[in-house]
């Protein structure tokens, strides 16, 4: 209801842009009385339709079909962004959709997306060591983790994928542990770091070791527990070499841990 109220407060001369790849959004748009919105995504009903995705190691490429009421259908071909993952493609499509409705030319839109430098802590390449590439990402929610790992798997098909995960907030992990435990299916291994409590004082309420076992069961991956960043460094020095992708995930201190790994390995 809050989302519906928010969208219906957009004035008549404005527009909302809604990704209908999300099942909740599909339900929301059925209930919106004021139809001043556009839809986008891979869903075939999208007015800005993402098609023909080509996922490579350094970038994503796709076509964007534009199907707006009262206008001729058009396509922007070979849209390229220097980012990987469907979540980034959706974000780029949202930005493109807004600029298209503002009358910006397709040429400028393609150029702008191609030259976009990204943002910090979103699949940032940190360093390479013994053929292993290390990345840092802010993902700290089950859906984010799934999307990032899906993108990594599509881009790096031959490499072993290792996720270094630091849960953020005890309460979030406790409430969503089932969702979290199923989020790592596209990884080969998970290195589970201590929870970043973010000021929370209450007890965990379940055994962390059992959470590790739950990941093994639900995501079908190997799980390693480390107690601090120095143990992580020791593990990395002994095990992380060869063609591997190591991606740190979390909203806490894991970013610093990943950036200090070169000094520990």
Predicted regions and their residues:
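Acidic, Mg2+-coordinating active-site environments of NTP-dependent enzymes
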Residues: 1-134, 213-216, 222
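Structural beta-sheet core signal
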Residues: 18, 39, 163-165, 192, ...
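Short acidic-hydrophobic, aromatic-tinged amphipathic segments that line or gate anion-handling sites
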Residues: 223-228
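A glycine-rich beta-strand to alpha-helix segment
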Residues: 231-262
């Amino acid at each position: 209801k809050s989302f519906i109220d928010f969208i219906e407060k957009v004035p008549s001369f404005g527009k909302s842009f809604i990704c209908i790849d999300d099942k909740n959004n599909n339900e929301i748009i059925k209930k919106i009385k004021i139809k001043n919105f556009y839809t986008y995504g891979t869903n075939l009903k999208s007015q800005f339709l993402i098609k023909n995705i080509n996922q490579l190691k350094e970038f994503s490429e796709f076509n964007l079909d534009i199907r707006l009421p009262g206008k001729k259908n058009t396509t922007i071909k070979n849209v390229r962004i220097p980012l990987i993952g469907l979540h980034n493609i959706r974000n780029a499509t949202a930005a493109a959709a807004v600029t298209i409705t503002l009358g910006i030319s397709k040429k400028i839109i393609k150029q702008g997306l191609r030259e976009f430098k990204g943002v910090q802590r979103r699949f940032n390449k940190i360093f390479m060591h013994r053929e292993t590439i290390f990345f840092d990402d802010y993902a700290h929610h089950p859906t984010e983790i799934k999307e990032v790992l899906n993108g990594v798997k599509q881009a790096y098909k031959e490499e072993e994928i290792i996720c270094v995960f630091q849960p953020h907030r005890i309460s979030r992990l406790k409430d969503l542990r089932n969702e979290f435990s199923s989020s790592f299916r596209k990884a080969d291994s998970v290195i589970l770091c201590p929870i970043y409590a973010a000021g929370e004082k209450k007890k965990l309420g379940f055994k962390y070791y059992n959470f590790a076992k739950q990941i093994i069961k639900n995501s079908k991956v190997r799980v390693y527990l480390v107690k601090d960043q120095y143990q992580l460094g020791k593990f990395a020095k002994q095990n992380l070499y060869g063609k591997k992708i190591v991606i740190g995930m979390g909203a806490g201190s894991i970013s610093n841990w990943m950036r200090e790994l070169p000094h520990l390995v």
